[in-house]
Amino acid sequence: MQMITLAQQAKIASVELAQFGNVQKNQALLTIAQQLEQRSAEILAANAKDIEFAKNQGISTAIIDRLLLNESRLQGIANDVRNVAKLADPVGQVIDGGVLNSGLKIERQRVPLGVILTIYEARPNVTIDVASLCLKTGNAVILRGGKETKFTNAVLVEVVQQALETAGLPKLAVQAVTDPDRVLLLELLKLDRYIDMVIPRGGAGLHQFCKENSTIPVIVGGIGVCHMFVEKSADQQKALELIANAKTQRPSTCNTLETLLVEKAIAGEFLPKLANRMKALDVTLHTDDLQKTEGIEPLDDARMRQEWLSLDLNVVVIDNLTKAVEHIREYGSQHSEAILTSDYQLARQFVAQVDAAAVYINASTRFTDGGEFGLGAEVAVSTQKLHARGPMGLEALTTYKWVCEGDYLVRK
């Protein structure tokens, strides 16, 4: 199928879908969740094919972890869809309004964006997360997954389209591009007449490619070079457990800790404790502030600007909070940054000075997630400042229109 035909179909479907209410949309969502559970064996078998292909291609373990589905992860995806169904539908909500001096009654109402193009790599969960959020908000979506998710996505898209049909909604509100040819992606990125927003979910290269080639607005985000600053007043034992969570719970995610900043005043005491704790968790430290032994490697400036997505952690000794903020400005990706401290004033200073979508005081960066923020599933974590920032839930997939009413009112 030509990309322009696919985009035109999506546009027509978005107009149709926008006319349906919450009841039918929720019916489709609940059917999706049910079918994910009932067809789990089929979905996991397809995923096993994708995993085998990825291993044969020499794809990294971090990417394979993102690609992997198991019973637990699939159940989690189904639960997320049910949670989306429980959320209030933002479409039609009146944001604000009133009656002006002219007598004009005016309201600002939430409406769907229209057609969303989502481009992602080895993340089959994105297929369902994005489809469910777009469905809930009355948006059509074009899903362009990577070649690594070919078999899994085929089954997942079939599940979604069948649920749409069962609920009496337009099947083509969710479509997939199955050919990984980048020429086709380039065509899609020029179809601003039909597509309203592009959301890339992948590495820095994918984001840069979309920014450079798209005539459609692009949401930039998902690159998480996340920092944590251990200030001298921090509870060191609690800090070690929090660092372990932020680094090791799921290393391949964008909200995982990548660089730890330790205040110089406590470095001599804290770093040996850190080294022991991380060694027990098979985490390799990259630092110039500890003697090079097993599990400790030299610090690499270039790697401090990138995600590890693995059990590797940069460790840098910093003079004070001001220097920590300067380091984050230089190396951070404006995703999630944290401070561990018992000093409330320093915590507020850190929050005020750090430029990031999410800033934490004595909490793990792993909380930067739509579900954890109470948004349901998310389409992305935006690190830009226009339209949306941080985890993008339902409201981020809407825009608004001004609805104005008068009694044959004319402007004087």
Curated annotation (Swiss-Prot):
The keyword Metal-binding does not apply. It comes from Actinobacillus pleuropneumoniae serotype 7 (strain AP76). This is Gamma-glutamyl phosphate reductase. Belongs to the gamma-glutamyl phosphate reductase family. GO terms for molecular function: glutamate-5-semialdehyde dehydrogenase activity; NADP binding. Its main location: cytoplasm. Keywords: Amino-acid biosynthesis, Cytoplasm, NADP, Oxidoreductase, Proline biosynthesis. Pathway: Amino-acid biosynthesis; L-proline biosynthesis; L-glutamate 5-semialdehyde from L-glutamate: step 2/2. It is found in: Cytoplasm. One of its GO terms (cellular component) is cytoplasm. One of its GO terms (biological process) is L-proline biosynthetic process. SUPFAM superfamilies: ALDH-like. Its EC number is 1.2.1.41. The gene is proA. Catalyzes the NADPH-dependent reduction of L-glutamate 5-phosphate into L-glutamate 5-semialdehyde and phosphate. The product spontaneously undergoes cyclization to form 1-pyrroline-5-carboxylate. It catalyses: L-glutamate 5-semialdehyde + phosphate + NADP(+) = L-glutamyl 5-phosphate + NADPH + H(+). It is an enzyme of class 1 (oxidoreductase).
